[in-house]
């Protein structure tokens, strides 16, 4: 018997129904949320991501604010765009689409975002608030993963979760979310320096793979019945490929498809962060 699919698309659609109602209420109060994007250059992947985000906005009634800039802009020109969105009352929250061209400092650009308008939940101030247990925008992908597990009744409280990958967008904040009292999981954070990774993953009730190494998590690394969340993105022969091998579906209890698992929820919680930011102004 194969694993249950952690279907992110259906779950995203449920979130969109809720968001559409909340946005309508905000609009009735004269406070329609606005999501901004800053896109530098013409990377096809980045363009596709930004198009998708604005298509999502249209579905739930959020206003779109786009700032598309040429690849050869200076740091000063990028800073001017960020400052303009920081001051723009129609922009509730926004993102700077990564990666930026190599002559631009990504960290400096992200730090320049007003933390109150940080739609991704990755500003150093907001990550610091997460560490302290204070209210702040949450990182979209980790938040989406927790929601997906809860949606399919995967037990989190008391579970041993092995996170593979220590990146800023998933690996590091994932542990912060899962060890909050509201989740109460025990987290082991693994990476390229981890010795005997399979020995750790075989103990896990939940595995979250976020390294971008195609099919690195195989069936022999998974405890029967465990939940496996695939966040990795690679291209193999031109096709998007995740970190989880196909044979894992025969051993695990739950597996997120990739694509179609976590990705839709990352986008859904980007919009959720913006809606919550606008709602907080009315509170």
UniProtKB/Swiss-Prot annotation:
Q: Which residues form the signal peptide?
A: none
Under InterPro entries, the record lists:
Aminoacid_DH-like_N_sf (IPR046346), NAD(P)-bd_dom_sf (IPR036291), THF_DH/CycHdrlase (IPR000672), THF_DH/CycHdrlase_cat_dom (IPR020630), THF_DH/CycHdrlase_NAD-bd_dom (IPR020631)
Catalytic activity as recorded in UniProt: (6R)-5,10-methylene-5,6,7,8-tetrahydrofolate + NADP(+) = (6R)-5,10-methenyltetrahydrofolate + NADPH; (6R)-5,10-methenyltetrahydrofolate + H2O = (6R)-10-formyltetrahydrofolate + H(+)
| GO CC aspect terms | cytosol
Q: What GO biological process, any one, is recorded here?
A: purine nucleotide biosynthetic process
* Sorted UniProt keywords: Amino-acid biosynthesis, Histidine biosynthesis, Hydrolase, Methionine biosynthesis, Multifunctional enzyme, NADP, One-carbon metabolism, Oxidoreductase, Purine biosynthesis
Q: State whether keyword Amino-acid biosynthesis applies.
A: yes
Q: List the cysteine pairs that form cystine.
A: none
EC assignment: 1.5.1.5, 3.5.4.9
UniProt pathway: One-carbon metabolism; tetrahydrofolate interconversion
Q: Which GO terms describe its molecular function?
A: methenyltetrahydrofolate cyclohydrolase activity; methylenetetrahydrofolate dehydrogenase (NADP+) activity
Instruction: Enumerate the residues binding NADP(+).
Output: 165-167, 192, 233
Role summary: Catalyzes the oxidation of 5,10-methylenetetrahydrofolate to 5,10-methenyltetrahydrofolate and then the hydrolysis of 5,10-methenyltetrahydrofolate to 10-formyltetrahydrofolate.
User: What is stated as this protein's family in its record?
Assistant: Belongs to the tetrahydrofolate dehydrogenase/cyclohydrolase family.
Q: How does it assemble?
A: Homodimer.
**Protein name per its UniProtKB record:** Bifunctional protein FolD
Q: What species does this protein belong to?
A: Mycolicibacterium smegmatis (strain ATCC 700084 / mc(2)155) (Mycobacterium smegmatis)
Its organism's taxonomic lineage begins at: Bacteria, Bacillati, Actinomycetota, Actinomycetes, Mycobacteriales
Q: Which gene encodes it?
A: folD
């Amino acid at each position: 018997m194969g694993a249950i699919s952690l279907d992110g698309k259906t779950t995203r659609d449920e979130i969109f129904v809720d968001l559409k109602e909340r946005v309508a209420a905000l609009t009735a109060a004269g406070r329609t949320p606005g999501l901004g994007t800053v896109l530098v250059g013409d990377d096809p992947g980045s363009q596709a991501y930004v198009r998708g985000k604005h298509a999502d906005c249209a579905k739930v009634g959020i206003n779109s604010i786009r700032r598309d800039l040429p690849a050869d802009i200076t740091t000063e020109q990028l800073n001017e765009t960020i400052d303009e969105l920081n001051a723009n009352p129609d922009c509730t929250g926004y993102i700077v689409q990564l990666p930026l061209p190599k002559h631009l400092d990504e960290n400096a650009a992200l730090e320049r975002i007003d933390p109150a308008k940080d739609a991704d939940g990755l500003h150093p101030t907001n990550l610091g608030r997460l560490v302290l247990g204070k209210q702040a925008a949450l990182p979209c992908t980790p938040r989406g993963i927790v929601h997906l597990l809860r949606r399919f009744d995967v037990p989190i409280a008391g579970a041993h979760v092995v996170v593979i990958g220590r990146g800023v967008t998933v690996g590091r904040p994932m542990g912060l979310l899962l060890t909050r009292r509201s989740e109460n999981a025990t987290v082991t954070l693994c990476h390229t320096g981890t010795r005997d990774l399979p020995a750790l993953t075989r103990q896990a009730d939940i595995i979250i793979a976020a390294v971008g190494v195609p099919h690195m998590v195989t069936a022999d690394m998974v405890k029967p019945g465990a939940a496996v969340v695939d966040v990795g993105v690679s291209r193999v022969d031109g096709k998007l490929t995740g970190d989880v091998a196909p044979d894992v579906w025969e051993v695990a209890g739950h597996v997120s498809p990739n694509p179609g698992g976590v990705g839709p929820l990352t986008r859904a919680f980007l919009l959720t962060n913006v809606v919550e930011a606008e709602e907080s102004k009315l509170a």
